[in-house]
């Protein structure tokens, strides 16, 4: 999860002019809730946490899943949005909805896990995934052609009173392992160098016995 990406989602999708940590945490809470929903509620295709590792991590060192959540819309916009299974599935493959700033169109997917909640039937999910497969912009590595793990939980997304997100009948959280996440590392490396050059926060580590 990349704070910069989540700030942008809050501004663009939710119309929050100056998002704070409360806004970011509320959005992240929806993601965590969706990932663990199948452990807590019934569904036709339940997925446990061990399956994430099995399906998303082809090699131990390639273990950096990219998170996407849809729909992220405010109550004002929800009136005009249909949010069908197909629409929220397609939204997960849009760079603007990802919680790390990178462009999957520049890389290839190794594995994808789609976790649906609410008013969702397996037939619609299969149709949405089949449509995604036909898109040329979404490419999978040659050695992992199937690439999709699906989860369906019947419990609808929980609406938080006075929260930022609108109440919706269905939602999807996507965890994917894509080579494009490599774009995030040089940016993170640069930010670290800037902070370390000013010795920001270094005193906390020195206080715990580490050398500067």
From Swiss-Prot:
Its EC number is 3.6.5.-. The active site is at residue 51. It is found in: Cytoplasm, Cytoskeleton. GO terms for biological process: microtubule-based process. Keywords: Cytoplasm, Cytoskeleton, GTP-binding, Hydrolase, Microtubule, Nucleotide-binding. Its cofactor is Mg(2+). It is an enzyme of class 3 (hydrolase). GTP binds at residues 3, 25. It catalyses: GTP + H2O = GDP + phosphate + H(+). SUPFAM superfamilies: Tubulin C-terminal domain-like, Tubulin nucleotide-binding domain-like. The keyword Hydrolase applies. Tubulin is the major constituent of microtubules, a cylinder consisting of laterally associated linear protofilaments composed of alpha- and beta-tubulin heterodimers. Microtubules grow by the addition of GTP-tubulin dimers to the microtubule end, where a stabilizing cap forms. Below the cap, tubulin dimers are in GDP-bound state, owing to GTPase activity of alpha-tubulin. Belongs to the tubulin family. PANTHER family: TUBULIN. Dimer of alpha and beta chains. A typical microtubule is a hollow water-filled tube with an outer diameter of 25 nm and an inner diameter of 15 nM. Alpha-beta heterodimers associate head-to-tail to form protofilaments running lengthwise along the microtubule wall with the beta-tubulin subunit facing the microtubule plus end conferring a structural polarity. Microtubules usually have 13 protofilaments but different protofilament numbers can be found in some organisms and specialized cells. This is Tubulin alpha chain. It comes from Pneumocystis carinii. The lineage of its organism: Eukaryota, Fungi, Dikarya, Ascomycota, Taphrinomycotina.
């Amino acid at each position: 999860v990349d704070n910069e990406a989540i700030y942008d989602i809050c501004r663009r999708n939710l119309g929050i002019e100056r998002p704070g940590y409360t806004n970011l945490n509320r959005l992240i809470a929806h993601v965590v809730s969706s990932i663990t929903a199948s452990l807590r509620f019934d569904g036709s295709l339940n997925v446990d946490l061990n399956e994430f590792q099995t399906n998303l991590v082809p090699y131990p060192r390639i273990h950096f899943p990219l998170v996407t959540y849809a729909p992220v819309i405010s109550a004002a916009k929800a009136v005009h949005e249909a949010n069908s299974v197909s629409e929220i599935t397609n939204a997960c493959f849009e760079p603007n909805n990802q919680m790390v700033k990178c462009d999957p169109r520049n890389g290839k997917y190794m594995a994808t896990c789609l976790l649906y909640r609410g008013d969702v039937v397996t037939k619609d999910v299969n149709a949405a995934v089949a449509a995604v497969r036909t898109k040329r912009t979404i490419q999978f590595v040659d050695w992992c052609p199937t690439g999709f793990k699906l989860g369906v939980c019947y419990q609808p997304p929980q609406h938080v009173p006075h929260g930022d997100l609108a109440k919706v009948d269905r939602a999807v959280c996507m965890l994917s392992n894509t080579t494009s996440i490599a774009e995030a590392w040089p940016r993170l490396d640069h930010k670290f160098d800037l902070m370390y050059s000013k010795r920001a926060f270094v005193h906390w580590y020195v206080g715990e016995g580490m050398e500067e």
